[in-house]
């Protein structure tokens, strides 16, 4: 059985930073992820997204952020395509993972957990489905085309800004107000090749000569419809997350998120959690906040495992 000071579940941006920070403090660490590559949701869904709320970067592509974080983990063990299914506690308080790994502490950084995009609630055909997308992993698909983006959150607005560089874009949202950054909305309004269609919902889809006739219904007006011809549809309705595995492990959840203390500890001994998997009063889902939570958690784990050691906080130490 392999032995480690710390196991991290989740190799998204926050999990990767936690692994590098743990290594900085000398913790023997192993990181698991169910996917076959690092980066989590960013890498799977929007690697080309310009992320603008990371300190020291006015803007950085999702895939570049993941790449830089991954470089920092070169001295830690990473086990991909491994979905952790079982954790148990030994008599000596160590944690046993999948009967193969014995660790002194566990850090959960699984984000939304197993997630699936919320699908477009309209009847479609296989031919139509070929033109309906739920991520922007391959932006070249949309180049020089007319694209309808459905949704009003940050992802929809970010995708619209990115695609506007090479495509004509419709953004369809059921409300007049968007849920994303006001700066993004203002920027989109200034672009001649972007049209914001509010308050509308998609009503029907028809395929005609390999183009989609998108029928939109104006919210609150029973007989008000418009039709737009597009080549591709990009759906940004958010995701359904599944954290049932955490419940099986006995971890306390609140609204499907992990409840943590000020030290990022869960209700279980030596089990901590960080990032978008957790909740506490005032928390907002931001990557940069997750980085800070990783530092708090690793510092707490160090004090838990090695109380006799004097912690060095590198950023401000002389």
Curated annotation (Swiss-Prot):
Catalyzed reactions: 2 reduced [2Fe-2S]-[ferredoxin] + NADP(+) + H(+) = 2 oxidized [2Fe-2S]-[ferredoxin] + NADPH
Oxidoreductase among keywords: yes
Keyword Amino-acid biosynthesis annotated: no
Cofactor (UniProt): FAD
Residues bound to FAD: 33, 41, 46, 84, 115, 276, 316
Chain ranges passing through the membrane: none
EC number: 1.18.1.2
Coiled-coil features, chain-numbered ranges: none
An example Gene Ontology molecular-function term: flavin adenine dinucleotide binding
InterPro entries membership: FAD/NAD-bd_sf (IPR036188), FAD/NAD-binding_dom (IPR023753), Fd--NADP_Rdtase_type_2 (IPR022890), Ferredoxin-NADP_redctase_2 (IPR050097)
Binding partners and assembly: Homodimer.
Family classification: Belongs to the ferredoxin--NADP reductase type 2 family.
Xref: HAMAP family: FENR2 (MF_01685)
Protein name per UniProt: Ferredoxin--NADP reductase
């Amino acid at each position: 059985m392999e032995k480690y000071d710390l196991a991290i579940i989740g190799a998204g941006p926050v999990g990767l930073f936690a692994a590098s920070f743990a290594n900085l403090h000398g913790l023997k660490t192993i990181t698991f992820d169910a996917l076959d590559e690092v980066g989590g949701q960013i890498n799977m869904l929007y690697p080309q997204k310009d992320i603008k709320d990371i300190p020291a970067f006015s803007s950085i592509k999702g895939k570049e952020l993941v790449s830089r974080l991954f470089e920092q983990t070169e001295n830690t063990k990473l086990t991909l395509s491994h979905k952790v299914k079982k954790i148990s506690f030994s008599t000596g308080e160590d944690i046993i993972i999948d009967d193969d790994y014995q660790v002194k502490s566990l850090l959960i950084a699984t984000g939304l957990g197993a997630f699936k995009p919320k699908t477009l609630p309209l009847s479609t055909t296989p031919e139509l489905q070929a033109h309906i997308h739920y991520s922007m992993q391959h932006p070249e698909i949309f180049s020089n085309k007319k694209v309808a983006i459905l949704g009003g959150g940050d992802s929809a607005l970010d995708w619209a800004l990115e695609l506007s560089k090479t495509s004509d874009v419709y953004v369809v949202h059921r409300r007049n107000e968007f849920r994303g950054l006001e700066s993004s909305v203002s920027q989109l309004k200034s672009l001649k090749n972007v049209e914001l269609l509010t308050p509308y919902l998609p009503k029907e889809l028809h395929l005609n000569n390999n183009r989609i006739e998108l029928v939109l219904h104006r919210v609150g007006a029973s007989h008000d419809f418009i039709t737009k011809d597009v080549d591709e549809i990009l759906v940004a309705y958010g995701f359904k997350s599944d954290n049932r595995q955490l419940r099986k492990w006995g971890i306390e959840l609140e609204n499907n998120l992990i409840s943590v203390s000020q030290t990022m500890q869960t209700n279980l001994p030596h089990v901590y959690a960080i990032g978008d998997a957790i909740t506490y009063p005032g928390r907002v889902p931001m990557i940069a906040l997750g980085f800070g939570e990783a530092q708090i958690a690793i510092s707490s784990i160090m004090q838990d495992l090695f109380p006799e050691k004097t912690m060095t906080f590198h950023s401000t130490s002389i």
